[in-house]
A protein has these predicted regions:
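A structural motif corresponding to the C-terminal end of an alpha-helix
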Residues: 106-110, 187-202
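PAPS-dependent sulfation machinery
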Residues: 11-116
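Post-Walker A helix-loop "phosphate-sensing" segment adjacent to the P-loop in P-loop NTPases
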Residues: 4-12
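Anion-recognition interface
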Residues: 120, 124-127, 140, 167-190
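Phosphate-binding beta-loop-alpha motif at adenosine-nucleotide cofactor sites
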Residues: 114-121, 137, 175, 198-220, ...
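PAPS-dependent sulfotransferase catalytic core
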Residues: 151-183, 234-252
Length: 252
């Protein structure tokens, strides 16, 4: 969300990912339908907004667009589907990124000239297919302690699953997340280790640095992307940080 304040970057918004663009759908209707979906999440999973900000006009992770090709971490996040989860770790991700690129091209036709800023944990699983589909992509890899990542993700998954089930198996959840992230990180490290060009296109950011001094990290990222950080985006980012202090909607 902070990087989305930069005038040279654009992100898929939730309302854009929620509804495939159609000629007979006006934007306001798609935005309203997406807004209603966020309110439904508030009802069935009341604690979710303290874990992850969700809004029709906010930047949205790629999990929803990936889901249109039936390759997305979101399905196992919301429901316990062990067979699908096992398949997802071994499937061919190329169809997901072929569709993903087509989708972004449609969105970009309404706002051309800006660079896409994308985010989703599932990109780790399909990192090789992503690289082939987007050979000029730059990667920002965030490094955080596994002892913090897994409980955080488990909390998010448990909140989502509680909306559709009266029982959440936390032991299963923890084990599946550890395996999911092990597979994803292994693929990222193997690709970076086997292709020096990919490694050069990666910027490593420490999570503690990001939370402690976000504007300095933003400057590193914009320099890495060769984007100017002029006064206006910097001011907008400071305003964003003041409006959205950590813990504003609770903690988990």
């Amino acid at each position: 969300e902070l990087l989305d304040e930069h005038s040279g970057l654009q992100t898929p918004k939730l309302w854009q990912a929620d509804s495939v663009p159609e000629e007979n759908w006006s934007d306001w209707l798609r935005i309203f339908k997406s807004f209603l979906r966020t309110k439904l999440v508030d009802v069935i999973s009341p604690g979710f907004k303290s874990i992850h900000r969700l809004g029709a006009l906010l930047p949205h992770e790629c999990v929803t667009i990936q889901g249109l090709s039936f390759r997305s971490m979101q399905f196992h996040a919301i429901h316990r589907v062990d067979a699908y989860h096992e398949w997802l770790s071994a499937c061919d991700w190329r169809p997901a990124y072929l569709w993903h690129e087509r989708y972004l091209k449609i969105l970009a036709s309404e706002n051309p000239g800006k660079r896409w800023l994308l985010k989703a944990p599932g990109h780790m699983l399909g990192i090789s297919a992503l690289r082939k589909q987007y050979p000029d992509a730059k990667f920002i890899q965030l490094h955080r302690r596994p002892s913090e990542v897994i409980p955080s993700m488990a909390s998010l998954y448990a909140s989502l699953r509680s909306g559709s089930s009266n029982k959440v198996d936390f032991e299963e959840l923890g084990k599946s997340l550890v395996e999911e992230w092990r597979v994803g990180l292994t693929r990222v490290l193997e690709l970076r280790g086997s292709d020096s060009m990919v490694d050069q296109d990666c910027l490593d950011i420490d999570y503690q640095e990001m939370t402690g001094d976000p504007l300095t990290v933003v400057e590193k990222i914009t320099e890495f992307l060769e984007l100017p950080l002029v006064p206006d985006p910097r001011f907008k980012m400071r305003e964003y940080l003041l409006r959205n202090r950590k813990g504003k909607h609770g903690s988990h």
